[in-house]
């Protein structure tokens, strides 16, 4: 039996990955992390979407310690989300160590249930400037976890080389575009669906959706070509 663990926030990217995983694996587990993020609604959205999609299990883990250590606009209500980069070249929504912790815990969970695949929706093409969304970071984490647990498994990143328009196309491939558009929470200001329309996350999401809806055939063809290249 092919099992997979999906790191699941209830946002556009991780929901698209979850929909795909449910088609490709026999048993899919979702794991969501409560790190004291800006909007608790994120946890509720993840629980509802996971239930509606019928995952084998959905585990919500309390990792509140991350909130104490990682100061960010996503972990502090008194820090407004900014469109500008900080002096270190990163957006103030970057949560240091978040994906290091998440992938480590997801790997441990996969070990316990006998899953050989961990799936995360990080993306280097349209990422927000986060260093822990890069392909070389994921490969390094994969290597470290395999060595540290002496177990072969793979961290898969289905969205790594897709732009946001192609991510929408991928959701549409699995007849999940409306689900992703209406039921997910990507907005930094905590508004489900199309969001506030003002924060950096909403800007990226809307630009990708508009691109896809206005150029469906071309975007879908680009997605299919990338999928073929990956399979070779």
Swiss-Prot record:
Taxonomic source organism: Vibrio campbellii (strain ATCC BAA-1116)
Note accompanying the cofactor annotation: Binds 1 zinc ion per subunit.
Binding site for Zn(2+): 187, 196, 199, 202
Substrates-to-products reaction catalysed: 7-carboxy-7-deazaguanine + NH4(+) + ATP = 7-cyano-7-deazaguanine + ADP + phosphate + H2O + H(+)
UniProt record similarity statement: Belongs to the QueC family.
Stored HAMAP family: QueC
Protein name as catalogued: 7-cyano-7-deazaguanine synthase
One example GO MF annotation: zinc ion binding
GO process terms (BP): queuosine biosynthetic process
Listed pathway(s): Purine metabolism; 7-cyano-7-deazaguanine biosynthesis
Entry-linked NCBIfam families: 7-cyano-7-deazaguanine synthase QueC, PRK11106.1
Coiled coil stretches, renumbered: none
């Amino acid at each position: 039996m092919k099992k997979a663990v999906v790191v699941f926030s209830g946002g556009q990217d991780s929901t698209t990955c979850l929909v795909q995983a449910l088609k490709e694996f026999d048993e899919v587990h979702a794991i969501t992390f409560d790190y004291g993020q800006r909007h608790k609604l994120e946890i509720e959205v993840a629980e509802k979407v996971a239930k509606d999609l019928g995952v084998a299990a959905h585990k919500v883990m309390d990792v509140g310690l991350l909130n104490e250590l990682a100061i960010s606009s996503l972990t502090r209500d008194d820090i407004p989300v900014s469109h500008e980069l900080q002096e270190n070249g990163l957006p103030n929504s970057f949560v240091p160590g978040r994906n290091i912790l998440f992938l480590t815990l997801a790997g441990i969970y996969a070990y316990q249930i006998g899953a050989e695949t961990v799936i995360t929706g990080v993306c280097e093409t349209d990422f927000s400037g986060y260093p822990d969304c890069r392909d070389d970071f994921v490969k390094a984490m994969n290597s470290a976890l395999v060595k540290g647990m002496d177990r072969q498994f793979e961290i898969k990143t289905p969205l790594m080389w897709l732009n946001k328009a192609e991510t929408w196309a991928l959701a549409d491939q699995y007849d999940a575009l409306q689900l992703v558009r209406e039921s997910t929470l990507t907005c930094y200001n905590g508004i489900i669906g199309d969001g506030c329309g003002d924060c950096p996350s909403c800007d990226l999401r809307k630009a990708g959706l508009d691109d896809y809806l206005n150029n469906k055939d071309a975007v879908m063809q680009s997605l299919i070509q990338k999928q073929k290249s990956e399979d070779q």
